[in-house]
């Protein structure tokens, strides 16, 4: 979280950090206010975690769970599975109110969200300087999800920022992103192509 410190907007009270992995997805709902203090001291202050959960849905596990279904059937079932995992969080009034009032935003960090961002930006090759720190609206990202679903698994690898290695996992990744964003339908997502290494370096200063 420290590595994503400067991605927190100054007027933000709360941040929902979504980290999509292969076997799980980590959700951290944090108090962003301590991060607003200036200088190195503020940079090293870890925002207090108000709520945290590790969900047993990742791009690999979700892909494997629905591999027996055709794509057009698999996606809605993947999405329904993800939505079932976050039902309790969706009903949390504090989270709903923070995003409804504009006091919160999402930070997304994972290969899935960075690949989706690259496609959304129309990059002909992956560029970290364009992706890291970029803002994505829900409308723009969901438009990319629909584009990838229409292309299908057979053509997923043709998108430059996806390629062959990640193509087989993107359908599940799209379902997770769509499901997670339902927690903050009015919130934009700040994209982070960073994480543990940057946080460790800052902690050593």
Predicted regions and their residues:
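Internal, well-ordered alpha/beta segment that forms a basic, Gly-enriched binding/recognition surface
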Residues: 32
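Ser/Thr-glycine-rich phosphate-binding loops at phosphate-binding pockets of nucleotides
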Residues: 21-26, 111
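Helical "lid/coupling" subdomains associated with nucleotide-phosphate turnover
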Residues: 1-14, 29, 37-39, 46-205
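Short aromatic-hydrophobic micro-motifs that form the base-stacking/packing surface
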Residues: 16-18
């Amino acid at each position: 979280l420290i590595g994503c410190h400067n991605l927190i907007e100054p007027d933000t009270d709360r941040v929902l950090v979504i980290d999509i992995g292969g076997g799980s997805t980590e959700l951290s709902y944090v108090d962003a206010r301590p991060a607003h203090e200036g200088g190195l001291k503020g940079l090293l202050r870890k925002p207090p975690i108000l709520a945290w959960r590790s969900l047993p849905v990742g791009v690999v596990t979700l892909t494997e769970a629905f591999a027996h279904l055709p794509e057009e059937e698999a996606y809605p079932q993947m999405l329904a599975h993800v939505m079932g995992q976050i039902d309790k969080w969706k009903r949390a009034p504090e989270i709903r109110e923070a995003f409804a009032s504009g006091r919160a935003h999402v930070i997304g960090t994972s290969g899935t969200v960075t690949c989706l961002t690259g496609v959304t930006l129309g990059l002909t090759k992956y560029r970290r300087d364009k992706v890291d720190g970029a803002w994505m609206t829900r409308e723009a990202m969901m438009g990319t999800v629909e584009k990838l679903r229409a292309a299908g698994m057979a053509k997923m690898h043709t998108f430059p920022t996806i390629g062959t290695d990640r193509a087989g996992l993107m359908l599940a990744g799209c379902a997770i992103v769509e499901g997670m964003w339902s927690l903050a339908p009015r919130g934009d997502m700040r994209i982070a192509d960073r994480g543990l290494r940057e946080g460790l370096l800052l902690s050593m200063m």
